[in-house]
Amino acid sequence: MSLTRFSLCLLLTLLLAAIPVYLASPDPGVRILRSPESTVAPPGDEVVFVCETSLPPEHFEWSYASSRSRFRYLKSGNHNISITHDNDISKLRVVVSLETLGEYRCVAWFGPLAVTSTTARLELAALSGGGGDEGFKGNQAHWRVTAGNTVQWHCGHIESNPAPSWSFYYNDIELPAASTLSDSNGTLLLSNVSVASSGSYRCVATNTASGVRLALPSRLELQVSAEAMPATAPHLLDGQRVRTKVARVGESVLLLCPGVGCPSPTAIWSSPNVPGAIKNNRTRVLPYGLQINELQALDGGTYICYLDNGIRPALKHSIQLLVQQAPRIVLAPSANLTNEGEAMQLECVATGIPEPEIYWLLNGNNSANDSKANPGSNGILILQSVQKRHAGYVQCFARNSLGEDSAGTILQVNPTQIQTGDGGGGSRAYVRPQQHMFGRKQKQQTQMVPPSAPNVTRLSDESVMLRWHVMPNEGLPIKFFKVQYRMLTGTGKSWQTTNENIPYGKERNDYGAVKNFTSSVTGLRPDRRYRFRIMAVYSNNDNKESNTSGKFFLQRGATLAPLAVPSLVDIEEYSQTAVVLHWDLTSDADEDLISGYYAYYRPSASAGEYLKATIDGAKSRSFQISALEPGTIYEFKLQSFSAVAASEFSALKQGRTQRPRVSTTTEPAVHAMDTTTPSHNETFNLNPLLTGTIGGGALLVLLVVSACLCLCRRRSSRGTNQQNKPRLAELREDFVPLNTCSPNKPRTRHLHITLNPLAQQQQQQQQQQQQQQQQQHEEKDTQDNDMSYFQRPPVVYDAEALGFNGMARMSSSSLRRSQRTLERAAAAGGGAGSGTNNNNLNQPTDGSTADSPRLQASNKPGRVILKRARLSSRSENLSSGSLNSVGV
C-alpha cells in the first residue's frame, strides 16, 4: 500500500514538472457577449436584464449591490425578482422599487472559473424643478428687440433622470416646432423674429420614462419693434449667459452664440486651441451657432464667437466644449503560469473622459477584499503572494459616468510541492482551471449581436417614429428587423408585432460605421404609455430582441397647428445607385416650426411599402438617398416634422438613377489565330435574343439540308429500279422450263433428259415455231414478265396432268414462265392432238387450257425445274457450252 502511494505521488510530481509555461491570451475563449444595460424606470415598472456568454456555462448567478452594501448573490425566491436561464442566456426580471435600486451584474461559472459581466445600474425616474417658484424669479425676462434678430431664451434648470423633453408655449398655445437642446436646460430658439413674434412664452419639461410633466414658472415677454431704432452694437439680453457645453463622442453638438443688435449681427467663429475645428467636413456654421457632427475627443476645447454688425465694439463669446468618452481598455492584462507563493504584477490600461476608474475581480471577487492583492495606481494589480484561490479568471474593469468596459485573462497557479512522510515526492491536489473551458467549440460564427434599444418620437396621434442602430460587429448578418410594442395601460397586455419586415439594406464600404435605421408604428392610441423593442432576424433564421425602450407617453396633438408641407423641386441623378432630392418651403419663416424632414421612396413599378429616411435640420434643402438600383425610376415624397407632430405629405415626384454605362470603344480586328487555351474562369455571354436567332437559323438550315438529301436519295432509288428491270428479266430467264426455249434466243446448249428419247426431235420443232412468233410477242411478253413478277400471285400447276407422279415446289417466277411456255406451245401446235410428245407439256390431259383456273388450282404433282448457277452475263451463259441445268 505504501509502495502504491509512493508511485502515485511520484507520477503527479513528474506530470507537474512537465507542465510548460504558457502565455495567457487576452481572449481565453469564454467571455460575456452581452452584458446587462443600465435602465431608468418609474416605481412599479418591471425591467429585464439580459446576460449572454460565448459558451454555455455550468450555471449562472446574479449579484446585486445597493448604495449602502457590497455585492451579494441573489436568490430567485424573492418576490421582486425572477431569474430564468436558457442555455447560454440568463435573464433577471426586477420590479422597480426603492429596495431594488442599485447595481446588477451576472456571473457565469465554467468549472472553477467565474466570468463576470459589466455593471448595470437601475435608477428611479425623477423630475424636479429645484427650489419652487422662488428659484425662478430671476428668469422672468422682458426683452425688446428689432425685427430680424435671433432670440435664444433659456427656460430654466431642472433635475430629471433621464433627460427631459421640452415643450414651449406662445400665448398659452403650444409651439410644435420648438428647437430644444439635449441637456437639462431647455433653450427656445426664435430665428429672424418679426412683429408677429411678440408675445408671452413659457416652457414645460416632460420626463420621458415616467411621462410626468413639470411646468416651469419662468416666462419671457418679447416685444419686436418694426419701427427703426437707434443703431446699437451687439449685446446680450438680460438672462442670457455663456456656458460650458458638455457632449459625448459620436454625438452632434450645437454651440449657440446669443446676442442682438441693430442691425442684426452676424457670427464669426474661431478656436485657438483646436486646430482645424472650424473648417472641416463635420462642422457647419449656422446663423445662430456652430454645429459639429460626429463629435471626436480632439474637438474638445475653447471656441470663440464674435458678433459683429459694423458698430463697435463687437461682442465676444468664449464657450468651453467638454467632450466625454466612454471607457475603453486598450491594454488587457496577461498572466503566465505562476508558482504558488510567488509575487505577480498585472497591468491594465484604459482610456476615457473623464478618466476611468480601474478595479479588479478575481473569480468574481473584488481584489480590494483580498489580503494578498494590492491594487495600485495606473491600473496595476500586485499579488504579493499568489495563492491557489487566485487560480481562475482575472478581470480588469474600467468605469466612468458614461459606462464600463472589461478585459480578462486566465491565471494558472502551480502548487507548492511537499515531501510525503515516506520520503517520496508528492504535491497538493491541483485542478487546472481551464479543464472545463477547452474541448468545446468557441461560439464565434453563431454570435448574434442585437440592435440597440429604439429611440421613440411622436409622429401623430396614432403613430410614432422609432430610431435604432447596429454597432460594427463580426457576428451573424442581419436579414431584417421586426418592431414590437406593448401598451402599459391595463393588465395582461402582451407584445404586439408589426407586419412590416424592415430590411437591413445593402452592405456598404464603410464597414466600421454605425448603421442607423428608422421605422414608424401606426395604430396606436393617444394618451397611453407604450414600450417598444426591435427584433432582429439573422442569417441562420434565428432572432434576438433588443433592450426595451423607456416608457413613452403618446400625447394627443389635435389642437396643434398644421406644419408647412415641403415642395419637391427637383430630383438629381447623382449616380447609378443614388439621387439627390431638392425641395423648398413656401416661406422661410416656416423653418421656425420644423425640426426636420422624413423622405419616403419606392420604385414606381412597385406597390409595396415606402422606404424611409430621416433628415435632421429645418434649414436642409437637399438630401442624398443611396443604395438604389441602377437605371430605375423611383417615386418620392417628403414630410416635415417637429417634436410633437408631422405635416401632410408633399406631392409625389418621380426620379431616375443613372443607367449603367455601356462601353462604346471599338476593339481592332485581330487576324492572327489565338492559340492560347482559355481559362476555366472565362465565360462567353450572348444576348438571349441573338442566341435564339442563331439557334433557330441553324435548325432551319439543318431541316433544308435533310430534305434535299431525302429527295436525292428518292430520285436515285427510282433510277436504280429502272436499270434493274432488264436484270430482273434476265434472272427470270435463268429458270428454263423443260422442252421450251428462250423468248429471245434458242437455248441449244441445255441438255434435257426426258422419259421418251424420241421427244427431242419434237422439242426442236417446237422451238423453231416459237422463234417465228418471238418478235410478235416480245413487247407484250416483256410487259407481262414485269407485271407478273411484281403483281401476280404464285401459280400452282397440276403435276399429274403434266405427266409427273411426284410433287415439287417451284418458285413463283418459274411457274409463271412455264405457264406462258404452255400457252405458246398450244398456239404453235394447233390443237390438242397435233403433238406427239409423250410429255404432254403443251396441253393438259383433261382438255383444259393453260390459263384455266382449274389448271392453276390443281394439287397434282408438277414438273421440277433446277436453277442453274448464275454467270456474269446472259450472253456468257448461252455461249459457255456447259450444262447449266437438268430438267427431269
Swiss-Prot record:
Disulfide bonds: C51-C106, C155-C203, C257-C305, C348-C396
Subcellular location per the Swiss-Prot or TrEMBL entry: Membrane
Residue numbers spanned by region Disordered: 655-679, 759-789, 812-864, 869-888
Residues modified by glycosylation: N80, N185, N192, N281, N336, N365, N369, N455, N516, N547, N681
Extracellular side: 25-688
Positions with a binding annotation for heparin: R486, K493, R531
Alphabetical list of CDD domains matching this protein: FN3, Ig
Domain annotation Fibronectin type-III: ranges: 450-557, 565-660
UniProt GO BP: compound eye development; cuticle pattern formation; homophilic cell adhesion via plasma membrane adhesion molecules; homotypic cell-cell adhesion; maintenance of protein location in extracellular region; segment specification; smoothened signaling pathway; wing disc anterior/posterior pattern formation
Cytoplasmic side: 710-888
Superkingdom as given in the UniProt entry: Eukaryota
PANTHER family membership: CONTACTIN 5 (PTHR45080), IG-LIKE DOMAIN-CONTAINING PROTEIN (PTHR45080:SF8)
Function of the protein: Mediates response to the active Hedgehog (Hh) protein signal in embryos, functioning upstream or at the level of patched (ptc).
Known partners and oligomeric status: Homodimer. Heterotetramer; 2 iHog chains bind 2 hh chains when facilitated by heparin, heparin is required to promote high-affinity interactions between hh and iHog.
Domain notes: The first fibronectin type-III domain mediates a specific interaction with Hh protein, in vitro. The second fibronectin type-III domain is additionally required for in vivo signaling activity.
Protein name as it appears in the record: Interference hedgehog
Source organism of the structure: Drosophila grimshawi (Hawaiian fruit fly)
Taxonomic lineage of the native organism: Eukaryota, Metazoa, Ecdysozoa, Arthropoda, Hexapoda
Name of the gene: iHog
